[in-house]
Structure formats: C-alpha cells, structure tokens
Amino acid sequence: AQEYVKNDWAVISKRLQAIYALHFLTPYPKMMWQFGELGYDVSIEENGRTGRKPVRWNYFEDANRRALYDAMSKIISWRTDHEDYYGQNEVAVHTWSVGDGNMGGKTLVMDKVIVVANFNNAESTTTISNPNPGEWTNLLTGEKVQVGSSHTFTLGASDYIVLVRE
C-alpha cells in the first residue's frame, strides 16, 4: 500500500479539487460547509463542537487554497449555468467508479460531463467508455479535447480532468 500525502497543501488542494468535481457534478442537490471551497482545516473540536470557529480570511493569500477556490468556482458555476441539464428528472450517469479500491482511476461519465481523477502518488492511466464521442471542453482551462467512444487518460500524481459538453 502506498503512503498518502497528508501535509502538502499543493497535493491536498489538487485532491480536494478532484473530490469536489466528482461531488458537485453528479445529479441532485449538494451542500458545502463554510470555507470548504478554501480547504477549511479547523477541527470540529475547536471551541467545542458547536462553538464559534475562527474565520480564515487569509486563506485567499495561499496560492493552493486560491487554486482550490478558483476550480470550485468554475465547477459550481458550470453546474448552475446548466440548470436545465441537472433539473431533469433523470440525468444519465453512465459510469460512476469512485467506490472501488483503484485510487488511480476514479471516474464520472455522463452525457455532458466527464471527470477522471487520480488520487495516487504516481502517474495513472484510466480508460473510459464515452457515450458521446467528439469535441469536449476542459472546464478548467478552456482547451478543446477530442474524446472517442473509448478514451484513455494518463494523469499525473494527484491530478484530475473535468471535461464538459454544451
């Protein structure tokens, strides 16, 4: 078993971005805890479980926390802007592979969304079946990507990709 990185905010930020992409881009209502978009890391025990917690306004000054915020902003904005898609009674989720032991190949494949995440400390390759081959857009970079009906992604350690289709 590999040793997971627990104290490097560059790694933690990327993994949180991937987790939030997998979470917020699936159907049904979602909720986020205060400052969750910045990786709030104050213990629930601080000042008692229900006591006031410190506000960490300085989180915006940390580049990794800012990257987390920026990624979450794009992810949630895309979902909000596509309310017609998420508001359907049935949104087809073609693949949802997040519960297995393969930390390198977590995937979400829907008609308009593809998320592939690698939670390993090393590069990982994952192949997906895509029901909508053609041109997709990388949500975070704006880059256009051709994705076939069977497509292989190679992601670096703790990396992820979010592709969307209008």
Where is each model-derived feature located?
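Carbohydrate-interacting/catalytic domains
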Residues: 9-13, 17, 22-32, 36-166
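Active-site clefts of carbohydrate-active enzymes
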Residues: 1-9
